[in-house]
């Protein structure tokens, strides 16, 4: 883990990364916000599908659980991606564009997400890649802010 759990808001926020995979080798490479359990987690990852960025979101032991996917042109080149979470307002952003949404669901309870890891919550699926920037915002950003943040 890294940072301070005081900098993470479990009820709303944005996980932002400017990242590139070392290879498009069809393996999961994850960055996660979690609490060390399967109950509540946000996993931003290059998936086992070629050139695909995904988010797995799970809150309150599965009261809300979904996956958002988007195909990028090349995961070995730097991409700016962001995932916004807020009750009934979830979105994946990539290179200046909102690419996938989920419009219903609850978020984790306050002070639930406590760790930021370059792997899955259980220590698997290490992120093998390059990182220029990684940030967690304590509030859900507006569409205009996310456009600006993720534009290359």
Language-model region placement:
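Short tryptophan-centered beta-strand motifs in secreted/extracellular beta-sheet-rich domains
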Residues: 76-94
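Short surface loop/edge beta-strand patches of beta-sandwich-type extracellular domains
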Residues: 1-12, 67-72, 122
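Extended recognition patches within non-cytosolic domains
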Residues: 1-11, 24-27, 99, 132-152
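A carbohydrate-recognition surface predominantly in extracellular/luminal proteins
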Residues: 8-22, 42, 77-79, 131-134
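Short, aromatic/His-centered strand-loop micro-motif at the edge of beta-sheets
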Residues: 57-80
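Extracellular glycan-interaction patches encoded by glycine-rich segments
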Residues: 111-136
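Short, solvent-exposed beta-strand-to-loop segments that form ligand-recognition rims
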Residues: 95-115
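Glycan-recognition/cleft segments
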Residues: 32-56
């Amino acid at each position: 883990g890294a940072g301070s759990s005081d900098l993470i808001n479990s009820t709303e926020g944005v996980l932002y990364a400017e990242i590139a995979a070392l290879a498009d080798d069809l393996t999961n490479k994850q960055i996660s916000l979690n609490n060390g359990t399967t109950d509540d987690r946000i996993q931003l990852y290059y998936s086992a599908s070629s050139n695909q960025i995904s988010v797995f979101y799970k809150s309150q032991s599965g009261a809300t659980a979904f996956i958002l996917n988007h195909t990028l042109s090349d995961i070995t080149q730097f991409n700016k991606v962001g995932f916004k979470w807020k009750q009934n307002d979830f979105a994946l952003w990539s290179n200046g564009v909102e690419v996938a949404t989920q419009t219903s669901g609850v978020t984790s309870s306050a002070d639930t997400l406590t760790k930021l890891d370059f792997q899955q919550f259980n220590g698997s699926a290490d992120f093998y890649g390059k990182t220029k920037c990684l940030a967690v915002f304590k509030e859900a950003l507006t569409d205009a802010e996310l456009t600006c943040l993720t534009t290359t």
